[in-house]
């Protein structure tokens, strides 16, 4: 009886020591898991911040582009250009906005997946705590564990599973980085195409505006200068008057020059009439001063 009691007493301290070792090992594992969890959270925070900043920038850029498109639409409508090209650009801008919103949703889903993986890591830590509590309960009841090597096996399996999951998370992180780089490249390509189309529309609008101005000038010249040319090219007008008026009309650019020409022509006509009257009056005076014999001859 005494030998049995001594053997049972010697067995209990060895069990207590092994349980203490297991407890310490599990505590270390839990601390390691907590540190890794904090590292993952710290890695996720800058990604979230970058995602939010990029989304804000994209939304602000889209708003500015919509405003510029509206301004261009107003300008094109004022200049009489076709609105179909502007409507197409607006549709393209709306499609770009929808694509960006879809990609943002995908990024949010990926962030949620990362958060779920962190929760899975927490569940693993809880599962590791479960055998700890069982061992403690068995010790309190005075029952010996069936196999002291079993918790170590479970711990090694948990470590392996955790390491595999960490590797998977890193692979997924690298894949997300590559996808993000591709997304940025596609966004830059779309922005460059969009800017190129806007520049082409501006060039076409300027060309149409110049054509409209040329037509207006030609109509203005036809309406204002052709009647004056017809009036000045009448058969009753003198040669000198025709030459001066034609020179003035070809060199003139507005109605003010035409009015000046009219006044000059009128003064020239008055001057020629006055010179003719002076000549006739001088001749009559000379004839009256001559004697009658000279007139008879």
Swiss-Prot record:
Coiled coil: 83-117
UniProt biased composition (Basic and acidic residues): 135-144, 152-161
Region (Disordered) location: 122-161
Keywords: Coiled coil
Name used for this protein in its record: Coiled-coil domain-containing protein 196
Species this chain originates from: Homo sapiens
